[in-house]
Every structure is written in structure tokens, then in C-alpha cells.
Amino acid sequence: MSEHFILQPGQLSLVSIKQILDEELSCVLAEHAFELIRASHQTVKKVIDEKKTVYGINTGFGSLANQTISSDCLKELQRNIVLSHACGTGKLLPDSVVALILLLKINNLSQGYSGVRLELINALIALFNHKVYPCIPSKGSVGASGDLVPLAHLSLPLLGEGEVRHQGQVISAEEGLKLAGLKPLELEAKEGLALLNGLQVSTALALSALFISETLFETAIISGSLSVDAASGSDVPFDDRIHQIRGHQAQISAASMYRNLLAGSQIRESHRHCNRVQDPYSLRCQPQIMGAVLHQMQFVGQTLQVEANAISDNPLVFAEQGDILSGGNFHGEIIAMAADNLALALSEIGGSAERRIALLIDKNFSGLPAFLVRESGLNSGFMIAHVTAASCASDNKALAHPHSVDSLPTSANQEDHVSMATSAARRLHEMIDNTSTILAIELLAACQGLEFHKPLKTSPQLDKIYQSVRSVVKEYDKDRYFAPDIEKIKKKILDKEFSLLTLTNE
């Protein structure tokens, strides 16, 4: 068993979430949560004992909320909601995302507002700790009432239904439960609804995208700096005085990153007093562009940290007052809007990088050989690699269309406005693939551009990146099979090898 962390319900930070997932820590629930969970469950039991009618406990669901269910059918009701709602489709979510969904659901239920038993939460913890991941199709949620469909698939294995994945292999839920030391559960009142109501899938998809996007942000700062040197660009636009008087802290921070990366470049010193007055915007305005990107990522991070600890169940149990209240915390509008903002940021990262690639291959702008290859004509060089980048950038622009402005009524118009948070977050992963492709091509193009400046060198910091690229992709002295080179650099990007923190610590 891996090392464990003690989960303090409602106190997850983005840093702790990353650590838990990266280090594959197992989960132990803080003991002080036990009484909160017990009191919440007792409140639900009291409703049943007193024969009160409360939504989600002894009624139907959605537009069937006005139908009262008899006491002897309550367990069947909870089983039925899981089975009937498990109707997702599409590719299965990756294990890393499912692990995060489990963690968020455990964190949600453990705060004592859902009325479930500790036994149910412990079963989820066992799945998480033994890396038994329910098979969750990626499509089917509209982000209100929560992520009903994918969370139903998350819950199926607890009943002994459906399939799970363990060590990359799809196996039956029955086998998975044995691996986790569990037997199928019989759900009690409200437990099925509590499992299904919530925004943990939308939040997990958005969080996992944010974590990778932070890596792409750093890579784009590095690749953009390399492009400045390869194109004989100026570092004057990164002067701190320019950015201080605009006042945006994220822009000020971004400009500092460019200054630090370019400091000490022999290439820059060789043309410091040349006649070129101003660079194209894709070089000159990088702090303004990437500062705006950083600002959006910071906003998204703040939003998702709150949501990671938020109670998005319905109805909600307030055990201290003995109240069970119906509300709308399951509506994912804030997640959808955060995901839309992150989509804009990803599109701008890729779009500005594509423009720099176009600049580098154009001899009239960069002063480098056409398409970054000698004997152009005989060789096409980076001509079509740029086309691939353009294709990905264009794809991102379509994917960046806001999902939060969309809504389709469901459940016979009872759920008449929905957030589309899940699809808003899910499409980010396709944008990440596109953006990492574009950045890989820019890194290759910029490093190729540096070849034509030899014996002059780029800065010591950027030379580390150049050497890292050249460790897996040699210089293009003539045309060759290009696609594998892009994939090699994409892997380095996604493995976080092009990190500003790594450069700083070396």
C-alpha cells in the first residue's frame, strides 16, 4: 500500500490534490468526520421513522418528485436510480480523472450534508486506495442536476454492477470489489441520490485540464522566448517599466519570465543596435498575451479549488437543526464558465504559437532560410509542419466556443436550465492535445532557427531547452519523416520536462 494522507473533509487545496494524485497516496478519513456523517445519517433515518415526505428520501426524482414511495420500497428506489441513470456513452474517462472523481466524491460526502452511512464512504475510499476505478463513459451529463449519468457509472460497482478498471485492465465489478476487499452494498434511503447528485465529474475534468494547462503555459513561455531569439527579435518589449505602468500583475510576471529566459543571449547581443524598430505582435506582445492567459488560469484555479470542496448534493441535510432542504447547488454554471475561460486561454496559447511558427518559416520576416531548411525547393522543411499547427489552432478556435451559453431542458422541463459544465470541461482535453502539438512544432522550429545563428548561442537558460530537444530530435539538414519528431517533443512537454521551475532549480 502506498503512503497515505489524512483527508480533512472540505479542506482540499490544489497543491494537495496534485500531490495525492502524483504520488498515488492512499486516503484515510480524519476521525472528526465520523460524528458529522453519523448525525447526518440519523437525520435521514428520523424522517423515515416519522413518516415525513421529503424529496429524494421517499419520493420519485426529477419531474416525478411528487410521487411518494412507500417505506418498504426505499432501498429498491435507491438501487433503481443508480441503474436507470447509468446510461452514458463515449470513450471511458482515463483512470487519472476517475481517481480524482472518487477523491472529490469522498471529500463531498464526508462533510456530513448528504445523510449517507460511513460504510458507503469507506467503500469509496477502498476503491480509491486499491486503484479500482469504475468505468465511466465520457458523455451523458448536462451539468445539472449534477453529473447524474457519469456518477451513476461511478456508483454501479458498489452494487456489484458494471465494470471497473484495475492496472489498465477492464474487469467485472464483482472482481473489482474483491480486489478492494468489498462486497456489494445495499443502498439505504437517499444514498443513491447522494452518490449521483454532485459535480465531481465536471470538476475533475476541469481540474485535470487546468493542471496540464499550467504545464503548457510554462512551455509556451519557453518556446516563445526561443522564437524571439531564433527570429532575431528584441528583448526591449519585456522591459519591466513597460509592464509596471499597465499594472496587471500577471502581465508583469510574464514579462519577468521572458527577461529571465533571454538574459545572456549572444544572439540578442549581436543585433542589439540593428535598424529593426519593432517586432511583429506575436513576438513583441507575448507578455500581454500570456499575462492574460495566466490571469485566466489563476481565476480558474481559485474557482475550482472552491468547487473541489463544495457541497453540490441535493437535498442537503443540516443535522444540527434537523432540517433537510432542497436547493440547486448541483447546477454547474460556475464550472462551465471557468472551463470556458480556460478554453479561451488554451486557444490563445496555441494561436499565438502558431503565428510565431508562421513568422519563423517566412524568410521575409525572420531572415532565416525559407521554411527553416537549406536547399528549400528540394526540401520543404517546416512548410507542412506549420500546416499541422494551423489545423490544430483552427480546431481550438471552434472548440473554444462557450458551452455555458448553451442549455437544453430535460426531465419534462423540470430541469429547464442546465449548465453543460461537463462538456465544457471535457473538450479542454482535446484542446490540450492540439495545443501541445502546436508548442512541440514551435520548439522544433525555434531550435532549428537557432542552427542558422551558430556559432552564436542563445541564453544559458534557453540552451538547456535546445539541448533537451536535440537529445531526441536532430537538426533538419534535409527532409525526413516528420511526425515522430513532433510526438517526441509532445511527450517531453506533457512529461513536464520544459518547466520554468526546473530551469530555475538547475
UniProtKB/Swiss-Prot annotation:
InterPro entries (UniProt xref): Aromatic_Lyase, Fumarase/histidase_N, HutH, L-Aspartase-like, Phe/His_NH3-lyase_AS
Record's keyword annotation contains Lyase: yes
One GO CC annotation: cytoplasm
Pathway it works in: Amino-acid degradation; L-histidine degradation into L-glutamate; N-formimidoyl-L-glutamate from L-histidine: step 1/3
GO biological process terms on file: L-histidine catabolic process to glutamate and formamide; L-histidine catabolic process to glutamate and formate
Catalytic activity: L-histidine = trans-urocanate + NH4(+)
Keyword annotations: Cytoplasm, Histidine metabolism, Lyase
GO molecular function: histidine ammonia-lyase activity
Pfam family, one: Lyase_aromatic
CDD domains listed in its UniProt record: PAL-HAL
PTMs per UniProt: Contains an active site 4-methylidene-imidazol-5-one (MIO), which is formed autocatalytically by cyclization and dehydration of residues Ala-Ser-Gly.
Signal peptide residues on this chain, from the entry's feature table: none
Residues bearing the modification 2,3-didehydroalanine (Ser): S145
Localization: Cytoplasm
Record SUPFAM superfamilies: L-aspartase-like (SSF48557)
Cross-link (5-imidazolinone (Ala-Gly)): A144-G146
Superkingdom: Bacteria
Similarity remark: Belongs to the PAL/histidase family.
Name the record gives this protein: Histidine ammonia-lyase
Organism the protein comes from: Legionella pneumophila (strain Paris)
Gene responsible for this protein: hutH
